[in-house]
From Swiss-Prot:
This is Probable urocanate hydratase. Belongs to the urocanase family. Pathway: Amino-acid degradation; L-histidine degradation into L-glutamate; N-formimidoyl-L-glutamate from L-histidine: step 2/3. NAD(+) binds at residues 49-50, 127, 194, 240-241, 261-265, 271-272, 320, 490. The active site is at 408. Its EC number is 4.2.1.49. InterPro entries: Urocanase, Urocanase-like, Urocanase_C, Urocanase_central_sf, Urocanase_CS, Urocanase_N, Urocanase_Rossmann-like, Urocanase_sf. The lineage of its organism: Archaea, Methanobacteriati, Thermoplasmatota, Thermoplasmata, Thermoplasmatales. It comes from Thermoplasma acidophilum (strain ATCC 25905 / DSM 1728 / JCM 9062 / NBRC 15155 / AMRC-C165).
Amino acid sequence: MESKVREIHAPRGKTLNTKGWGQEAALRLLMNNLDPMVAKDPANLIVYGGKGKAARNWEAFDKIVQELKRLENDETLLIQSGKPVGVFKTTKDAPRVLIVNAQIVPHWATDDVFWDLEARGLTMFGQMTAGSWIYIGTQGVLQGTYETLSALARKEFGKDDLSGKWVLTSGLGEMGGAQPLAITMNNASGIVVEVDEEKIKRRLRDKYLDTWTESLDEALKMKDESLAEGKPTSIGLLGNAATVYDELMRRGIVPDVVSDQTAAHDLNLGYIPEGYTVESAAKFRDENREEYIKRVYASIVKEARAILWFQRHGSKTFDYGNNFRTRAQEGGMKDAFEIPGYVPAYIRDLFAVGSGPFRWVALSGDPQDIYRIDDAIIKNFQKDQHLVRWIKLAKERVHFQGLPARICYASYGEREEIGLMINDMVRSGDLQAPVAIGRDHHDTGSVASPYRETEKMKDGSDAIADWPILNALLNAISGATWVSVHHGGGTAIGNAIHAGFVIVADGTKDAEERIKRVLNADPGIGVIRHADAGYESSIDIIKKGPKFRYPYIN
């Protein structure tokens, strides 16, 4: 892997380094993805999720920056798996950038083939928001984790939160690092197992984690004390998830909730086998990859068997979309899929009404711009108290990484309202500079992923991948500033196709019209996708007469 010591920070303020705010937003968010406060391994262009990268190599990064700086307001830059390959004259309403990452003909869409092509410099794994330049640090998954636990509390315990409960989970990487804060935001306590001490320290630094220990006994003691005192606490435990889960099972200790958010989808880099440190695992992997993978599988199976034991003894368990069950099944565990997936269990009801992880980034770099938007949402969206509660919690407790940003689950209709409100605030001068508005690929109508977002669809359409392609094409012609289509995010190569977009609110009338189109179309196709699969809540929205038509409902 190429390694070059460079420290990247996004420009701040009102001064343009490019010929327009669309290009400027792409430049700043590409660089923000590689900020040391944001990225997992910026020296190697890795942003998060195993090997999810922002650009194929440093030469490609430099060429992207060069082209963004000279790109006209009626030109479009093409990115092929992290590498700029062309600039074409289009129109001012066309995307400034089109990104396609990691696409591979289905018959060849296997880990071995893909990573061989990647090693030869022919492709790049972009995860979801790494290669599409809209990663905002651990906050990017925070509300999804918060919403999952909140929905679990309502469904499983009949309560609005998890007060008095404790959660066992693992993984404090760029995605899993959201878990401890999401747990305490739901008024629960949690033990989060992590094998890498540096990741524990990073979550402490960013105020996502309250405390940590190397001792299971000490972690259990702290958990018990926090529950007795009614003081939600997140505890990082340095150790291996397979070892810890198995030991808790042997002791007969049954948590209220159990999950895992290691990067188990990546067998090479994402899951450290039992008995190894991060450093010794890397040495072992380099010396004997075949045996290393066998050990990884054995550890995943051991952890999964413990999770099933917890489930059978009363724990509420779920796979959090990291392909953990698939890896356990590949390792020989036939009943791995008795562990439910989190989307069909807890999140699909949100997706069905066009709700998902909406986000915005202050290109000024000033946190006050985000706080002003927070205040405006609290004032203007009183009809949605769940949204207001989240914004208040996030404003109080979320630490920014890189450019200040906010995420919230907003539904069809709300996204357009928020986008137009932000554009008005830029126009009026309430905000110091334009704002980039986007979302995760993990959303209502933008992904086909049978082990995660589209698992157990009502009509059996789990693997139908037309929808994310339609989503990307629709967003492009509606006026998104950049659009991306990726492969394999979250659940690994061969298991998902997904799309994303970003649109810039620069305060102009043109931006207003583009926002109206894009923020109607993007969640709207999610409503259609779920209505087409037979979800009543989606059908109900269409019957109310939204700003689109579905031919099968008059």
